[in-house]
Amino acid sequence: MLAGCSSSSLLSPTRRLRSEAVAATSATVSAHFPMNTQRLDLPCSSSFSRKETPSSRPLGRSISLDNSNNNNNKPIERKTKTSGCSLKQNIKLPPLATTRGNGEGFSWNNDNNNRGKSLKRLAEEDESCLSRAKRTKCENEGGFWFEHFTGQDSSSPALPFSLTCSGDDEEKVCFVPSEVISQPLPNWVDSVITELAGIGDKDVESSLPAAVKEASGGSSTSASSESRSLSHRVPEPTNGSRNPYSHRGATEERTTGNINNNNNRNDLQRDFELVNLLTGCLDAIRSRNIAAINHFIARTGDLASPRGRTPMTRLIAYYIEALALRVARMWPHIFHIAPPREFDRTVEDESGNALRFLNQVTPIPKFIHFTANEMLLRAFEGKERVHIIDFDIKQGLQWPSFFQSLASRINPPHHVRITGIGESKLELNETGDRLHGFAEAMNLQFEFHPVVDRLEDVRLWMLHVKEGESVAVNCVMQMHKTLYDGTGAAIRDFLGLIRSTNPIALVLAEQEAEHNSEQLETRVCNSLKYYSAMFDAIHTNLATDSLMRVKVEEMLFGREIRNIVACEGSHRQERHVGFRHWRRMLEQLGFRSLGVSEREVLQSKMLLRMYGSDNEGFFNVERSDEDNGGEGGRGGGVTLRWSEQPLYTISAWTTGGN
């Protein structure tokens, strides 16, 4: 049971779930969705590549559980007409305890040499998808679901799997997924689901009964939603004449509506079952029940997929992958993971492309960059020599618009310098070259200083702070990585480094979430609610069959989920905490808030309107912690939300002496 959760938080915000609706159609779901692109490979502190194969060719490969007995390992292969890959297939048993020493850790399988399309090609292929999403996301009627891609013949039966547990004298058959009926939802799940459902999908309208008896004995309510984000409308005739086959069209429309309603009911059932399986897996890990762990991972691997039709189906795929990684590290003599060789390569370039894709279809990166830039411009008003220290500059997407704003001033600064910090020398050099080109086009005297090092290893002398410069620090989604030290020494050292530069402004952008609990159940509960909103936002803007969507979800958010769930200690870097935590810590260490100006709030709202986000259910902006605001009573930060779920907060700070 997930600690600290109210009983309604675990289903996708895109699906306005009502627990009674599920009871009306509580028959066991027999469809199995293999995890075609699922990954069980990545060490938590690294970034690895994942090449996408062409969509015309099913993804995945046959991987089996090892049935270890008398040192004679015979894998049970799952053969299908096409090569689907599920989580169940990716976990296998090691040799028996007699050969245990050779089997610990991950076994890397180098048999997959296929190279996929580049993300640049994916972007080109998805251009039509992008324009279609922007045209239709604000429509209020009609619905259309893209066909679910499984990469496997749906008629292929799921074969029973058995698990041999090392350490005992007898062989134990732990599960047969095709014959197992999932346990009922825990009592706390009802309120969790209701809370998450309130976040989003005001876009799916179901024909479920208005009042049904809840499976767990709860009260009755109505469930209504209709797909708006992926709506597909047939244009009406433009010559003013009526359709001579209107009676046929009405019949087809009713038939399509019935099919969509059935699909919606099935999706609700599957989402409920996935939540049930995820919580059951957490309980099994806590009780160290190896047989139950294997059952829950295998069953969830059948139903969840990164290419699933609903956001929750895709989201649970990444959570169960992370739990599989976790148990493989906890019990390396029992669980083995054999990922393809291509996962063992870093993919910084593809991560950058995924970030650019996200920038095209959602306002998230633009909100962070533009709001941070406005705070920096306010701090640099009237300054002649400005120096920005960016602790994670990446491709430098934030700075071209900043240069343009500086150059448009009546008295632009005489000299602009950016110190960019990163771990890739090549990427830093390329970023510096691009920024030089932008600055030259704006007639700004510009200097770029790269610092190739890890965040915790940066020292003051590396930053080249000079006299007469007005220094500002830009820290976007980096400070939470210093919270791994339970004593607080790492964050104090980092903030001490920032103070030593004597900045006129520290701009801080962080996830508005609580993902730093010591309890795994609490982290999963809080992060599931948070990333449900993120997946919902992406689902609204990209079609279900979009390869771009797969890459954005996997490379940006899937990695964060793996780190939050699978890692501990210094390897767990995604330790997100909310603005109130940062405010308390910064004030204790001598920083004070610069507040939020009205201009910054108005600009953020204007940006969201470009994405149609002034409508209810989309992105919205609000000031954070207004009661304890900074100068002039202004709020301490500005927060981007998806419906009722906070996502990111940006704030500006300065040292006490300024």
Swiss-Prot record:
Cellular component annotations (GO), alphabetically ordered: nucleus
InterPro entries on file: TF_GRAS
Region span, Disordered: 43-85, 96-115, 209-265
GO biological process, one term: regulation of DNA-templated transcription
Segments of this protein annotated with the region Leucine repeat I (LRI): 272-336
Gene Ontology MF term list: DNA-binding transcription factor activity
Region of interest: Leucine repeat II (LRII): 430-462
Magnesium found in the keyword field: no
Location of region: PFYRE: 471-563
Motif segment (VHIID): 386-390
Keyword tags: Nucleus, Transcription, Transcription regulation
Biased composition (Low complexity): 214-228
Superkingdom of the source species: Eukaryota
Pfam families with a match to the protein in the record: GRAS
Tissues with expression: Expressed in roots and sepals.
Subunit description: Interacts with SNRNP35 and CYP95.
Function: Probable transcription factor involved in plant development.
Recorded family membership: Belongs to the GRAS family.
Protein name: Scarecrow-like protein 28
Annotated organism of origin: Arabidopsis thaliana
Source lineage: Eukaryota, Viridiplantae, Streptophyta, Embryophyta, Tracheophyta
Gene behind this protein: SCL28
